[in-house]
Each structure stands twice: as structure tokens, then as C-alpha cells.
């Protein structure tokens, strides 16, 4: 039987329990100017409301909304260990906006979720500044978010991140893979590094190698290469779709599952892919990871982007003008394979 005790005469506050409302308010005021730089004319409200407002009227004739949500995996753990908080927000935005871009959609607005045990205003500001910058660079409004201070839920100095994006595309321009045909060409666009995938394996290899942060990888410190922000493909790809929409039958964002499992997601079930592994040279960081981790080729292909962050599935007679357009925007690219009709169950062949 539970015995009731006399209540303490010492008054308690929410701050005593570990939640500092004043710190949260200070954070909001600090990030307001950063967030406003990402706003678009369609944004109808500022920060602080119960719901964020976005006016879609007049922009599309027959809009289809495309939504996506993601995190940054255990790259976040590495960022916290290194005390590098200002670019992980760019990763968060990129993982979401690059996904919705695949269907030809323009990212409209973004919301973030930041959770921690004890709110550190400087750390949170650095993280959200990266989110705001990523949104600004994608033409996507950071329209709202949630900062959750939850005592006892996270160890000191740790936090978690999630993002949510809404995009729109004219129904007639929606890319769903249905136009893909045998003989279509795969154009691979360069990544900035591992982006935000495979970091549980990367961290294991890095730690097993003795955490060689300063190791020179072709003129760049290893840790700088590993922490390079995920490339934001939105603006150049939207521009490409505007000028060459008939040339592109499908697109793929190379994330978890690597080249093996992502491109095939946008290919009709009766077709497959032949990827030429010699069509491009994997960046040195992937060569180091494979060597140091003694990774099989198959493990590389299904874990990492291996230097290809985004793929266009294009009609063959438009490859040259697409390549020129990509060159004009400074995007390194290669013809990495073709769509074919498979015999048997193997739909993806890399060799």
C-alpha cells in the first residue's frame, strides 16, 4: 500500500523541472531574422502562430502537393562529437527537398523539429541557421517548426532533428516514371561526398582507423570531407525542367540504399538498369572508406552514393543538350548507364 507523505513547502517551477521557457523565447527572437530571409511572397504569417499560412492561389492551374519528411541519420552524432552544428541543418533540408524534387515538384515550405534534453541557445541557433540557409538556397520558406526541451530524454549536449517539406507540381508535369523506356540514359550528377547516408558504417570505419580527422584526402581533411553538407539540387534541376522537361523521364535522389536501390524505385517493374561502374571515378573519400573498411563492391553500391547524388533518366537524343545545360550550371555529370529489359529477376546490374 502506498503511503502518502506531506507535501514539501518548497515551491517548484517549470524551470526547476528542466524546461526553460525564457530560453525558448530568446531562441525564437534570435532566429527570426534568419528565418525571414527564407520567406517567399506566398508566406502569410510570421513565427509564433499555432499554424503557418501559405497562399497557393494563382500559382498553379492544377497543383499536386508532394510531401516528404526525413532526418540526417547518425551524421548528427558525428556533428555533435565534433561540435559542428552550423551545417547539419543544410543536410536536413537537402534530404527533404531533394526527395520531393524527384517528382518534378518545387519545394514551397519547410518545418523543422529540434528536440533536446536541455536547450543550448547557441547550439540551437547554429543548427537552425543552417536550416534557414538550406531553405533560402532551395527557394523554400522555413515557415515554422518546433523546439522541444525534454529533460531526461537526451544526454547532455545531444539533440535530434527532423524535417518536413511540402512541394507542388502541375499535374501535367508530374514525374512518376511512367514515361521511362528501354534505352533511356542514366545521367549521374556529382555528390559533395557521402551526403547524409551510411554514417553508422562511416563512423565505425572512422573509429576503427583511429579517428584520423586530419588525414589528407586529396588536399582536404578527412573530417571536412565527411562533414561536407549534402548538395542541394533544387534550383539547377528546376531550371533544367523548365527548359528540357520533355527530355527527362524520371529522376532519383541517391540516399539510403545507394545506387543499387534508389534509381530502380522510379523505373517501371518490367524494366531494369545497367550501370557502368567505370563511367566515373569515385571520389577519394569513398576509396578510403572501401579500403579502410575492407568493404565489398556490393556493400559500397547499396550503402553509399559513391559520388553520384542525383540521377536523371533521359531520352537518348536529348543527352547532349542536357549535358550542356548541366555544364552551364557548373554541375559535374556522367552518363552512368541505361535502362534495359531484364531477363530473369536481376533488375539492377552494376559492373
Swiss-Prot record:
Top-level division of the source organism's lineage: Bacteria
Pfam families in UniProt: AIRS, AIRS_C
Main location: cytoplasm
A cellular component term, taken from the record's GO annotations: cytosol
Keywords: ATP-binding, Cytoplasm, Ligase, Nucleotide-binding, Purine biosynthesis
EC number(s) from the headed UniProt entry: 6.3.3.1
Compartment annotation: Cytoplasm
One GO MF term attached to the UniProt entry: phosphoribosylamine-glycine ligase activity
DNA-binding listed as a keyword: no
UniProt pathway: Purine metabolism; IMP biosynthesis via de novo pathway; 5-amino-1-(5-phospho-D-ribosyl)imidazole from N(2)-formyl-N(1)-(5-phospho-D-ribosyl)glycinamide: step 2/2
Residues in the signal sequence: none
Catalytic activity, as annotated: 2-formamido-N(1)-(5-O-phospho-beta-D-ribosyl)acetamidine + ATP = 5-amino-1-(5-phospho-beta-D-ribosyl)imidazole + ADP + phosphate + H(+)
Listed GO biological process terms: 'de novo' IMP biosynthetic process; adenine biosynthetic process
Sequence similarity: Belongs to the AIR synthase family.
Cited NCBIfam families: purM
HAMAP family reported for this sequence: AIRS (MF_00741)
Protein name: Phosphoribosylformylglycinamidine cyclo-ligase
Species per Swiss-Prot/TrEMBL record: Xylella fastidiosa (strain 9a5c)
